[in-house]
């Protein structure tokens, strides 16, 4: 049963990613089912893997919630690495290049992109190992830091996202102070939320950035649906019919958010044991 719940939760995280991605891109790029299900398939893979690695008891709503957030992070990281360093695509359709760029100009050498991508992934892995060891030290009793200080470390993904976003966007759009600090601030908030449901520092770190992406993308995509995303600024809408067709996916998206909120409520009601307890 745990495996089945992990599959469903992973699928939900993947479809959530797929839907906001489709909603913002389809008027400019059109729609294909293989592209839409790409994130869903990643979620189906990562959901069970995260469950197995952390040995989560999915009979508890709190663990389903953190599984969703952690899976979300894994899916996003995989897709961003793929799009930035691996995928070959014409960048002229974008106002802001989506693949690795320097001062707003795409890096033409595929080999150079792969090398930079390797070191990027290496840094992420090293950060993950450091957080994993921090978690071991905490549970062994050798780390007696204030929980709110630990949450600063758990929000490290927000800083990685902020610097990566500034590197990509600032040469084209200019540097925005609020935009730069938004991800770290929201990441700290969700690290706090995740810490109410689990005392695993690594899971808190993963949920921190996972839920940050989920909420920020929901805000940008669905609260301002007529405003083109930065990467398509000034670009023509080539598939205007999808401004209407995409709305058919809204019930699924809303249902997934309801699922997440219900798991959070049940987790609180059932008395989840977290890093932070009131």
Predicted regions: what is each one?
Residues 1-5, 25-33, 54-67, 132-152, ...:
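Membrane-helix interface and helix-disruption motif detector
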Residues 104-115, 229-258:
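Interfacial loop-to-transmembrane junctions
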Residues 52-81, 201-218:
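Alpha-helical transmembrane-segment detector that highlights a single hydrophobic TM helix
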Residues 98-174:
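Generic multipass alpha-helical transmembrane bundles of integral membrane proteins
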Residues 5-25, 156-165:
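N-terminal signal-anchor/start-transfer transmembrane helix
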Residues 38-56, 182-197:
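A generic, lipid-embedded transmembrane alpha helix
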Residues 113-130, 247-271:
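Final/C-terminal transmembrane alpha-helix of multipass membrane proteins
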Residues 83-97, 171-175, 221-236:
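A cytosolic-side transmembrane-helix exit/cap motif
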């Amino acid at each position: 049963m745990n495996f089945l719940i992990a599959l469903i939760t992973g699928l939900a995280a993947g479809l959530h990613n797929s839907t906001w991605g489709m909603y913002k891109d389809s008027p400019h790029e059109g729609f294909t089912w293989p592209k839409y299900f790409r994130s869903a398939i990643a979620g189906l893979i990562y959901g069970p893997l995260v469950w197995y690695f952390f040995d989560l008891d999915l009979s508890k709503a709190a663990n389903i919630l953190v599984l969703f957030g952690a899976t979300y992070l894994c899916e996003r990281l995989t897709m961003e690495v793929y799009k930035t360093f691996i995928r070959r695509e014409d960048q002229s359709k974008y106002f802001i290049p989506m693949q690795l760029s320097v001062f707003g100009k795409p890096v033409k050498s595929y080999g150079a992109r792969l090398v930079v991508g390797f070191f990027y992934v290496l840094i992420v892995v090293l950060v993950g190992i450091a957080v994993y060891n921090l978690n071991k030290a905490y549970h062994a009793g050798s780390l007696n830091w204030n929980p709110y200080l630990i949450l600063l470390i758990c929000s490290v993904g927000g800083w990685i996202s902020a610097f990566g976003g500034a590197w990509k966007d600032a040469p084209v759009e200019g540097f925005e102070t609020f935009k730069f600090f938004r991800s770290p601030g929201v990441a700290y908030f969700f690290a706090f939320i995740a810490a109410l449901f689990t005392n695993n520092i690594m899971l808190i770190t993963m949920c921190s950035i996972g839920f940050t992406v989920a909420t920020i993308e929901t805000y940008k995509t669905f609260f301002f649906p007529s405003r083109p995303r930065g990467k398509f600024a000034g670009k023509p809408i080539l598939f205007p019919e999808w401004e209407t067709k995409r709305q058919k996916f809204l019930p699924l998206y809303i249902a997934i958010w309801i699922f997440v909120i219900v798991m959070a409520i049940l987790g609180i009601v059932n008395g989840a044991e977290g890093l932070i307890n009131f």
